[in-house]
Amino acid sequence: MNISVLASGSRGNCTLIHDDNNAVLIDMGISTRKLKQALAQLHLNIEDLDAIFITHEHIDHIRGLKTLTKNYNVPIYSKTATLKQIAITQKFTDINLKKLPSTYN
């Protein structure tokens, strides 16, 4: 497993966890263009993403989420309250938002 910090700080947060078969983003606080560039350096593309997990709704964690979801159908997971805030503040409709289960096995 590899962990690649694509961006960190108040201007955007985005971390990729990946191996040979799976790729998951933690937060999408960068533009889709910057994400494409960062993934290309790792020999990946957006279509390789299996999911995006959003830790919370602050803009530095979701800045590029709306644009990404307009063009790609990557499932987005987070807590119910976070998903509701994102839907309201970012005016999201018809995107692939998924509620995380409240317990994990």
List PLM regions with ranges.
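Conserved beta-strand hairpin/beta-sheet module of binuclear metal-dependent hydrolase folds
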Residues: 1-42
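Generic structural signal for residues in well-ordered beta-strands
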Residues: 3, 76, 95-97
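A generic "binding-loop/recognition-motif" signal
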Residues: 11, 31, 58, 82, ...
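A generic structural signal for short beta-strands and their flanking turns/coil linkers
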Residues: 13, 22, 48-50, 72, ...
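Short beta->alpha hinge that forms the Motif I/post-I loop of the SAM-binding pocket
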Residues: 28, 78-81
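Active-site metal-binding motif and surrounding structural segment of the metallo-beta-lactamase
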Residues: 33-79
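Metallo-beta-lactamase
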Residues: 80-105
